Amino acid sequence: MIILGIESSHDDTSIAILENKKVLFQLSLSQVKTHEKFGGTIPEIASREHVKNINILLTMLIEKFDLSKLDYIAYTEKPGLIGALQIGFLFASALSISLNKKLIPINHLEAHFFSSEITNEILYPAVGLVVSGGHSLIYYVKNVNSLEIIGETLDDAIGEVFDKISRKLNLGFPGGPIIDRISSEIVGDIKFTIPKTERDLDFSFSGIKTQVINYINNSKNLDINNVASSFQKTTIDYIEEKLKLAIKKHHPQSLVVGGGVSANTELRKRLSTLHANVLFPKKEYTTDNGAMIAITAFLKLNKSS
């Protein structure tokens, strides 16, 4: 089974060809440099960039692969920026019509969960953590077609908060890799408190964000690196606390972590100790990518056959 996966939900344009579970190749173009001066993604600009980038990737794809060999075309249906999603859908639809291949709509967040399947096998039931710039949630997964959200952020996503704190500290964009690097060099010792939520598996990252911003605003001699490292430690403490509870409640056979923030070095180190079978995607499959869309389509098609 050969599947083309198309991802365009935010600011990465990516396409990948998957044969069964093997990634034949993946082509991606990022818009980070385009949005860097704004300190975040501008939806209208993102849509225009997707139009340009998806045509570049198509040209590269045709040079590498005979599209007539495809069995299915999978694309990100939701969630994401409306305009960006529409570009991916129109591109997928045009290919579907011209090649007479079936379209498979894929949920972007589920794809982040299943990205670990590219190199690992998920044992079910599983608890899944998806952490990215736009989303933070915990899944309980019985099988490929049964994903239940048992915890989610009530406000900001963790990646969004990393960007805001980084911007407040004048460290740059995107904030996640910058703060991760700083935290690998020093251990912060500022004590920020972990927010409480009504549902015990939900998150409130804005509570941490507000504490850190207030600390920055009220500090006369600000140690930027200490603040950055202390902020990261608090957020990982928070996530670890929630996952320990989820594992205790649901007794999973796997703990699966996905999304852009899953590339964080300290997060990987800390969460690896929580369960005997902890799965992370390879670093190239943590950010938004076409391979995770294709593998999700493959798994769902296999399950239904």
Curated annotation (Swiss-Prot):
Q: Where in the cell is it found?
A: Cytoplasm
Q: What Gene Ontology cellular component terms go with this record? A: cytoplasm
Question: SUPFAM superfamilies in the record, alphabetically?
Answer: Actin-like ATPase domain
Q: Which residues bind Fe cation?
A: H108, H112, D288
Recall the GO molecular function terms of this protein's record: iron ion binding; N(6)-L-threonylcarbamoyladenine synthase activity
Cofactor(s) needed for function: Fe(2+)
Q: Which residues bind substrate?
A: V130, V131, S132, G133, G134, D163, G176, D180, N264
Q: How is the cofactor bound?
A: Binds 1 Fe(2+) ion per subunit.
Q: Which reaction does it catalyse?
A: L-threonylcarbamoyladenylate + adenosine(37) in tRNA = N(6)-L-threonylcarbamoyladenosine(37) in tRNA + AMP + H(+)
Give the enzyme's EC designation: 2.3.1.234
Going by the record, the broad EC class of this enzyme is transferase
Keywords assigned? Acyltransferase, Cytoplasm, Iron, Metal-binding, Transferase, tRNA processing
Q: Report the InterPro entries cross-referenced here.
A: ATPase_NBD, Gcp-like_dom, KAE1/TsaD, TsaD
Q: Name one Pfam family in it.
A: TsaD
* GO BP terms: tRNA threonylcarbamoyladenosine modification
Return the Gene3D superfamilies for the record.
3.30.420.40
What's its job? Required for the formation of a threonylcarbamoyl group on adenosine at position 37 (t(6)A37) in tRNAs that read codons beginning with adenine. Is involved in the transfer of the threonylcarbamoyl moiety of threonylcarbamoyl-AMP (TC-AMP) to the N6 group of A37, together with TsaE and TsaB. TsaD likely plays a direct catalytic role in this reaction.
Q: Which family is it part of?
A: Belongs to the KAE1 / TsaD family.
Name recorded for this polypeptide: tRNA N6-adenosine threonylcarbamoyltransferase
> What is the protein's species of origin?
Mycoplasma mobile (strain ATCC 43663 / 163K / NCTC 11711) (Mesomycoplasma mobile)
What is the name of the gene encoding this protein?
A: tsaD
